[in-house]
A protein has these predicted regions:
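Extended ligand-binding clefts on enzyme/binding-domain cores
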Residues: 1-41, 45-131, 139
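CBM-like carbohydrate-recognition segments
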Residues: 93-103, 119-129, 135-226
Length: 226
């Protein structure tokens, strides 16, 4: 409900709020994509607890319409890979639109046999973005590409099973490959690897979290006016 209090009139959720509660002036595509997924998950959990929250699903529907029909509603962040694949990974874009979205950004963000660049103007490949992009392709039905992307994260794997956050592959062959941030292996990177492997393999009941629509038991209930 705190998140929904940060909606603009068009239904987009602003990115942040100052300590004095002054809202920022813009919404992010990546953030709103994550929020629409969280709202649907929250509504499904609320159903299980016997406390239906149909207004959460209604708010997610509004976000879906914005994401699929009016990308101009969001602050431009085309440099970042997350803005490319998050609408697909989180289920806002599906079907032909999802496939087209992923195809459109592939050449801008993907280094073949390396992975997904965090930003499109640097040679910095991150295991988390590569894994999340694999989930997005899995959600769009391109499981073979998803597997390939996940395999590309193997150079990030340490002997202890953790994963280096990022690797910079220099454009000039004579330059040295470096890890960036230096020698960082992060929990969020490991989490992204686990989620991608599960989505691709179907290894747990949670494997469809990003690849199938979130089903509500009380979907027939009407939301209050927003």
């Amino acid at each position: 409900n705190w998140v929904l209090d940060m909606r603009r009139e068009d239904g987009a959720v602003i990115w942040a709020r100052e300590v004095d509660s002054q809202p920022w002036g813009y919404a992010l595509l990546t953030g709103c994509s994550s929020i629409r997924h969280a709202l649907r998950c929250g509504a499904a959990l609320a159903d299980l607890l016997g406390d239906p929250q149909p207004e959460w699903t209604s708010a997610a529907d509004v976000l879906d319409r914005l994401i699929t029909t009016n990308l101009e509603a969001f602050e431009p962040k085309e440099r970042w890979a997350m803005d490319w694949y998050y609408p697909v990974m989180t289920g806002a874009m599906t079907g032909a639109q999802a496939k087209a979205r992923l195809a459109e950004g592939w050449d801008r963000f993907v280094l073949d046999d390396r992975g997904v660049r965090c930003v499109n103007d640097e040679q910095w490949v991150t295991a988390a973005e590569t894994s999340e992009c694999a989930i997005a392709h899995c959600a769009a039905g391109d499981r073979d590409i998803a597997r390939e992307l996940l395999l590309w994260t193997m150079p990030h794997r340490r002997e202890d099973g953790a994963y280096w956050t990022g690797i910079v592959y220099p454009a000039e062959p004579e330059k040295t490959i470096v890890r960036f941030p230096a020698d960082e292996y992060s929990a969020y990177t490991a989490a992204a690897i686990i989620l991608a492997a599960d989505a691709i393999s179907g290894g747990s009941p949670a494997s469809t979290l990003f690849t199938q629509p979130i089903v509500r038991k009380n979907a027939h209930l009407k939301a209050r006016a927003l």
